[in-house]
Regions:
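Active-site glycine/GP-rich loop and adjacent strand/helix microenvironment
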Residues: 76-279
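A short, flexible beta-alpha/helix-coil linker loop
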Residues: 19, 60, 148-151
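Active-site diphosphate/adenylate-binding microenvironment
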Residues: 1-12, 18-24, 40-45, 62-64
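Conserved AMP-binding loop of ANL adenylate-forming enzymes
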Residues: 39-76
Length: 279
């Protein structure tokens, strides 16, 4: 691990069970590599230019600390790929229509980036938003969202229904789900826009293991094991999660990505509900 005098940033684990959270210590080199790889992955969606960015959350500037939670780490990590940042929610957690309309009037007619956690986006852009208070829609938005699927499962909303509901409500059509752990920040698995499967990159891989921890066959559900080349200041190269998924065996997709494709089916029953949206 990294010497104490080389610690650049400390992250709290998003997946640790129990009262005492595991901590991930990053040196400057590891943090930089994570940012570079995340940039390469996101460029396939948003291009090379930073876009105006709407964050579906409260402004976290007053609660940033040296020890950053998974949620704040994700907001920080994605924010560097946007500009002219605006936050949907005020300090009370309510939709700030004044701020939202200023953003949409200025940037709504061109491509803009939206980031948020799955359930928070759904709660605010579908359940709570009042269209009568809007002066523009989200048709030019590019939404990247992750985490919070446990909450969506509890209200019986699938990934396909999620996309359909957001389009019908606010005309948001460019929607990308991602899967990732704070323990492997940068090595996210982004959803293919054509087949809607999650995909690996050249920096990461996924293995599915059965209940005996043997490698599962294609199409067989099991525990998700995530692997990344990025960790250099902490032992996070291979992590066996409590998430359940399966490898999707597809010979081809119009995106032409050569990668492992997989789906998430939720978390192991009775495991502790933890993740970015729960912190």
């Amino acid at each position: 691990s990294v010497p104490k005098n080389k610690i650049f940033k400390t992250l709290n684990s998003s997946g640790t069970s129990g009262k005492k959270k595991s901590k991930i210590f990053l040196d400057s080199n590891n943090a930089r590599n994570q940012q570079l790889v995340l940039s390469k992955i996101l460029k396939t969606i948003i291009g090379n230019k930073r876009l105006p960015m709407l964050i579906i959350d409260k402004n976290p500037k007053n609660i940033y600390k040296s020890e950053i939670s998974a949620k704040l780490a994700a907001i920080n990590g994605f924010s560097i790929f946007g500009r002219e940042h605006s936050y949907l929610l005020n300090e009370k957690g309510e939709i700030d229509y004044l701020n939202l309309n200023i953003f949409l009037e200025k940037y709504g007619n061109t491509n803009f980036l939206i980031f948020g956690f799955t359930s928070t986006v759904y709660e605010n852009l579908f359940s709570k938003i009042n269209l009568k208070n809007l002066k523009n829609n989200f048709s030019n938005g590019i939404l990247i969202h992750g985490g919070g699927w446990k909450k969506m499962e509890s209200i019986k909303v699938s990934n396909a229904e999620y996309k359909k509901k957001l389009f019908n409500k606010v005309k948001l059509k460019n929607i990308y789900n991602y899967y990732g752990l704070v323990e492997q920040t940068g090595s996210i698995f982004i959803e293919c826009q054509y087949c809607n499967d999650l995909t690996t990159s050249i920096f990461s891989e996924v293995i599915i293991r059965d209940k005996y921890l043997n490698v599962a066959t294609s199409g067989q559900k099991g525990f998700i094991q995530v692997m990344s080349l990025l960790p250099s200041s902490y032992p996070g190269h291979s992590i066996l999660t409590e998430d359940i998924g399966e490898i999707i065996n597809k010979n081809s997709c119009v995106c032409s990505k050569y990668s492992t494709r997989f789906k998430i089916h939720g978390r192991l029953p009775e495991s502790e509900i933890r993740g970015c949206s729960n912190i």
